[in-house]
Amino acid sequence: MNTAIKPLVLLLIGGATTAAQAAAPGDEVIPVKKSTLVNLVDLLVQRGVLKPDEGQGLVRAAEQEAAETQAAQVKSNEAKAATSTAEDAGEPANSAPKTGKTKHVGYVPEFVKKEIRDQVRAELKAEVLQDVKQDAKTEGWGIPAALPEWVAAIHPSFDMRVRFADEFYGKENAGGIANAGLDAAGNFFGPYNWLAINRLANSPQGGLQRQVSQNPNEAIVNNQIDRLRLRERFRLGFEANLSDGLKAGVRFATSNLNNPVSNDQTLGNTGQSYQFAIDRAYLRYDYLDERKTSWFSLYAGRIINPFLSTDVVFDPDLSFEGVAGSVRLPFNRGTSKLAGYKAPNPTARFGINQGQQTPDSLFLTLGVFPLQDIDVSVNDKWLYAGQVGADWLVWHDSRLNLAASYYEFQNVNARRNPIGSHVYDWTAPQFVQKGNSMVAITDDQTLNGVCDDTVGCLFGLASRFKVFNATAMFDYAGFDPVHVLLTADYAKNLGYNQQKILTEFANGVVNYTDSRPRTTAYQIRADIGQVEVRHFGDWSVNLAYRYVQRDAVLDAFTDSIFHLGGTNAKGWVIGTQYGLSKYAWLNLRWLSTDAIDGPKYSIDTVNVDLNARF
């Protein structure tokens, strides 16, 4: 600001001083005293407009110019006096009368002129350059001519996360490797790695008890020794606009190929390469009317979670395979309430999915998703899902989401093999975490001679899963840009049948001492801060309490961080996010959880995530 004002100030001072000192007594010029000039210069120096050496130089220059002007004026007056008599005597009768006034032109020092020229040139150059850059960006100079049209339609995305995961186990935890998977009463507890046990089910090493005794590090999940891991996730995606409303997308990601709820790669594979997989591959069609309002969306392939939900039911990293469609009935379209409103990223808050909906609409979403392909098609495992809800922009940017969902998982529950048969081996789960009630598909009664374990050799889920889920989210924007998001989530498994389990399976539930229905889950959560952490200094904090009984939801798809994955857990979650730059932010979460049923099993988990994206 000072550099822009300074040349003008110097010009005013120089011009005013010179004019005042050179003026004749009859001129209409206000004389400026030397003391006034000095005081003015001192004031400008104090205000920071001029530097001290510039002020002193200005005063000296003004004094010198005044002296020279005064000397010149004296000589001019003497010359006029010497010639005045002759001029008066010989003046023609028709000559013009003299006014007695002299015109003066203010003198501007050269250094002031130079500074003005340099300042104007620099400011003009900056303004022109900025205008050119803006026009080039807006009009896309050079791109249409240099690249094919289809290239300009492709939009890349990238994100990367490095995680420090520290896990602290309760010192009084029961079971575990040290106790051979037994609780204090000698009951089988584990916690067991069911996938590792099932892999050897039909081999000479098969059987839970044999696996526990011969290979405890694989058969039993660690729940006593603290652990620190460094993990990394890398994702690279592309989405292409093929035509009006039609898009195609693909996303590559680091991945544990056998884990659908985590894209994390644990560091420590020196000499080996990371697993890199296609995490998403899909087509999406949006029907738009003449107002560009989206009434209908159709997804096919390996797609994003299309449902309004939380990580109580579905982990944030979970992708859905199949077909889904969403129909929206807009309301309040005749008002200006939606003008200027931009819906935030629906997954910006970790663990929350606000759905692929638009504000001020009623919606219905249906989906059919194959979970596992079996040789005989009637035995394929499926997820049939439906959701109805409302998305309401209440006032300004405050938004209310309500949804009721029903998720039916077909053919995921275990069936006991007939004697001497493997016919129901396919009912063993392809992936589980921990928590759901387990039963023996094969035991010493069904395949005596092949399986001699009294507990069992091959295990599956005891319960059917028909999950009702109700979710409510209210995003209050009264403190904008700080928002307050309140979330309530409730889930109930309607498919659990205790009598059927006890009738079909002789040993009943093998990982709990009872088979009573434990089928309820809920979460209460509050988020305070910016909706999206996208710039330096942006922040967000959250606090949640979660309670998930063992058969409330399918443990394979629920959050993989809370209680280190699975169900039968309750506890608190505290988290914060802070923006480090436009493309980087820090995420810190602390989770403290305990088992609801069974022997004591406590875990404290700390995750520190460094994230980057563009």
Language model segments and positions:
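Secretion/assembly modules of Gram-negative surface proteins
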Residues: 23-24, 53, 126-157, 166-173, ...
